[in-house]
């Protein structure tokens, strides 16, 4: 599946936030001023219309989870079909992606690295190899690193970084065995307050 291959820090500067969570690996400020827009001196950010705010929020979340436009729209359509709050459904679908769950469990330092682990067949779901980053993980699914991949230094480094932050309450992880359980779907209160999913729903509802 296609994915964005351009400069990621530029996207983070455009959205004004660390989209790819590289600050967990190294200080992103050491590479660029995250609060400044792209450009030699950082272009002045214009005041946005309601539509502009909605579009920026959609782009921010889409890029954060590494999803292209068509797939992101499909996630919205699916979330609208499900019972309950559409915005919360959308975030749960994104959080349930295998590459994201691998990241949440700490096996990858970033979502991009976690996606690569999945694509390179380093991840097992309930004992079977799954190499589709968008695979939908369900409650009680067991996620593990394949035996022959456990010696990869980047996985050990990622787990070391993950050990410095709080493990999400909706997963349980055994770092020694390099496996974890997706215990439940995250609730809205579990997720980042920096995301305003209502703006995305308003955008797609037009």
UniProtKB/Swiss-Prot annotation:
Please give the positions of the paired cysteines in each disulfide bond. Answer: none
GO terms assigned for molecular function: rRNA binding; structural constituent of ribosome
Task: Name one process (GO BP) from the record.
Answer: translation
Alphabetized UniProt keyword annotations: Ribonucleoprotein, Ribosomal protein, RNA-binding, rRNA-binding
May I have one GO cellular component term? small ribosomal subunit
Which Pfam family name is an example for this entry? Ribosomal_S4
Which residue ranges does the record assign to the S4 RNA-binding domain? 96-156
User: Which SMART domains does this entry report, sorted A to Z?
Assistant: Ribosomal_S4, S4
**Coiled coil (residue ranges):** none
The family this protein is said to belong to: Belongs to the universal ribosomal protein uS4 family.
Q: How does it assemble?
A: Part of the 30S ribosomal subunit. Contacts protein S5. The interaction surface between S4 and S5 is involved in control of translational fidelity.
Which HAMAP family does this one have?
Ribosomal_uS4_B (MF_01306_B)
Summary of the function given for this chain in its UniProt record: One of the primary rRNA binding proteins, it binds directly to 16S rRNA where it nucleates assembly of the body of the 30S subunit. With S5 and S12 plays an important role in translational accuracy.
- Name of this chain's protein: Small ribosomal subunit protein uS4B
Tell me which species this is from: Psychromonas ingrahamii (strain DSM 17664 / CCUG 51855 / 37)
